[in-house]
């Protein structure tokens, strides 16, 4: 449940319908976190409802069905493991500031970091 303010007394403004979606924490108030989603909507969530596991969405801003390649190595010349549709959800294994290693269903590989929502440009995750 995402609320209007940092309290259980505040109105619920929306409910996430899909588990594991990435959010950006933009503020804190006691045990509440103000989060923003990939569409720019924000609200307050109780801290225990959030996970420390990093996930990303593949180019959710794309209006056309332009797939993003999942490469076998950190190189555009590497073989393509899969073609990822916009808004596919993936688990982050690591990021080096330019590439992220992802796990998506039965696939794993590398995606250019600027094609992902849920990690910052240049962010390094080990």
Regions found by a protein language model. Name each.
Residues 1, 7-8, 15, 22-24, ...:
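Boundary regions of SH3-family modules and the immediately adjacent low-complexity/disordered segments
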